[in-house]
Amino acid sequence: MGASTGKLASERFFRSWSSEDNAKAVVLVSHGLGEHSGRYDHVARAFTANHLHVYALDHIGHGHSPGKRAFVSSFGDLTTGVEELRSHIGSEHPDLPVVLIGHSMGGLIAARA
């Protein structure tokens, strides 16, 4: 199944992929510097095939989110976006655990969020 897209209250863009059957958890993907959520479509498809829902955020200044491209004035701007998406996920899937994964800069963001 393809990705759905949305925007958070902060105008940050995200993609989501849904498992076709009962999901066991939700994976939140945090991408690296200069990347965007669409680069993780193949990863999301593998997770959804294994009964997981997936969400991926375009960090501020990346992909379809607002801001100067690949520029971050404060590291807190990055963790705030992940926290906002995590809250959104909690409202959509209140009974499922959320697992954060990150690549490169996204790993540090996930560890700090």
State what each model feature region is.
Residues 24-32:
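Short beta-strand element of the alpha/beta-hydrolase
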Residues 39, 44-67:
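Conserved alpha/beta-hydrolase
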Residues 1-21:
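N-terminal cap/lid segment of alpha/beta-hydrolase-fold proteins
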Residues 34-37, 63-89, 93:
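Catalytic nucleophile-loop/oxyanion-hole region of alpha/beta-hydrolase
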Residues 102-112:
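Glycine-rich nucleophile elbow surrounding the catalytic serine of serine-hydrolase chemistry
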Residues 93-104:
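Alpha/beta-hydrolase fold nucleophile elbow
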Residues 24, 51-52, 95-97:
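Short coil/turn segments at beta-strand junctions that form active-site/ligand-binding loops
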Residues 42, 112-113:
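Active-site signature of alpha/beta-hydrolase-fold catalytic machinery across serine-
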